[in-house]
């Protein structure tokens, strides 16, 4: 489990035990959920739809053996059911906003009953954009419910009537891999449900999603030119675990994710000019497109690297990057190459 997330969760659970620190606990919980949800947002906004049905760890023992789509669905179907059927006692977001049809899901359950290739087949049927809108709505609704809780509410337990309600809802499969959830939830008070599923459950599955997307990016980059169009080295980029490079569909570089068509302006320009990269362009020194826009603090560092490639070639560029990382401790090249591309080029040449 992510060490920082684990420590954060432990602190929140500890604060929940005392009335004097209850409000602080809820505030920290909401902030923590926002932090974790941002990871889901980045994954949904950064990767192609095909990524969400892939199982790079199929057959493995663990949550990472699922798909990205299944993981998202599972987290929030459980949350929607628990938050509304049990705690709020009202209707699920899934039904009130017609997300069943909007997402195109063949089931209404948590998905625990699905095994192996069933998970991939299920994932392929989902509309990822609508799925994201659903989970965002669930998250916001749950946050409101959590924010309205009092310390006394934490001890509220759930009787047989709630159990029967859950069974009647058909939102939990009768399959042995799923039906146990009803007894599990009904055996907890609200404080226990805050832990599972509103916090720790998120941690486990979002961590699994990170493993899945890291593997997908690694697979996507296999055999692909590690030098980006703008002149960066994907092998040395601090986003290397998140990004599959701008030469694949798994590009999550900032200028790709910000672009309306998810294509970096530098990539688009190079393709229009039939160039391998900006380093082949005779307008490079004066270029203000994409990564080279003056307001970008990494513009001159990128330009310095592109100029180095033009002068010495890609192989030597990758070697100088190795030496640069041996000599300096940094994440972003602008920390070393500075804000003047001529000075940055000089540093590269002297490294």
Task: Describe each model-derived feature in a short phrase.
Residues 25, 29-43, 78, 124-127, ...:
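Alpha-helical packing segments of well-folded alpha/beta enzyme cores
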Residues 27, 31, 58-62, 66-69, ...:
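Short, solvent-exposed segments of well-ordered alpha helices
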Residues 141-190, 308-351:
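A generic hydrophobic-segment detector
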Residues 35-46, 50, 175-176, 241, ...:
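Short, contiguous, well-structured surface segments enriched in hydrophobic/aromatic residues
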Residues 18-21, 115-125, 180-190:
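Short glycine/proline-rich turn/loop motifs
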Residues 1-39:
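Terminal targeting/low-complexity segments that flank the catalytic cores of oxidoreductases
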Residues 220-351:
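Cysteine-centered metal-binding/redox modules
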């Amino acid at each position: 489990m992510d060490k920082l997330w684990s420590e954060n969760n432990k602190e929140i659970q500890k604060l929940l035990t005392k009335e004097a620190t209850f409000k602080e606990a809820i505030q920290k919980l909401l902030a923590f959920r926002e932090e974790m949800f941002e990871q889901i947002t980045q994954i949904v906004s950064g990767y192609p739809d095909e990524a969400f049905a892939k199982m790079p760890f199929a057959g493995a023992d663990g949550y990472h053996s699922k798909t990205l789509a299944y993981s998202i669905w599972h987290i929030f179907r459980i949350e929607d059911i628990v938050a509304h059927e049990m705690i709020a006692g009202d209707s699920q977001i899934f039904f009130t906003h017609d997300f069943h049809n909007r997402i195109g899901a063949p089931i209404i359950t948590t998905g625990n009953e699905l095994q192996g290739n069933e998970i991939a087949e299920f994932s392929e049927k989902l509309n990822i954009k609508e799925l994201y809108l659903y989970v965002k709505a669930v998250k916001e609704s749950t946050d409101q419910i959590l924010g309205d809780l009092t310390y006394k509410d934490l001890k509220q337990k759930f009787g047989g009537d709630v159990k029967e309600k859950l069974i009647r809802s058909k939102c939990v499969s009768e399959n042995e891999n799923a039906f146990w959830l009803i007894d599990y939830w009904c055996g907890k008070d609200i404080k226990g449900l805050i832990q599972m599923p509103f916090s720790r459950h998120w941690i486990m599955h979002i961590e699994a999603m990170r493993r899945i997307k890291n593997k997908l990016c690694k697979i996507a980059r296999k055999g692909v030119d590690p030098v980006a169009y703008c002149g960066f080295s994907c092998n040395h980029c601090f986003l290397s675990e998140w990004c599959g490079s701008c030469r694949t569909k798994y590009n999550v570089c900032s200028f790709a994710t910000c672009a309306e068509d998810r294509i970096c302006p530098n990539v688009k320009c190079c393709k229009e000019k039939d160039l391998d990269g900006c380093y082949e362009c005779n307008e490079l020194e004066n270029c203000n497109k994409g990564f080279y826009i003056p307001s970008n603090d990494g513009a001159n560092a990128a330009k310095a690297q592109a100029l180095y490639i033009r002068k010495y070639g890609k192989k030597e560029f990758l070697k100088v990057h190795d030496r640069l990382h041996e000599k300096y401790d940094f994440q972003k090249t602008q920390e070393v190459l500075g804000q003047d591309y001529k000075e940055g080029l000089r540093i590269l040449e002297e490294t």
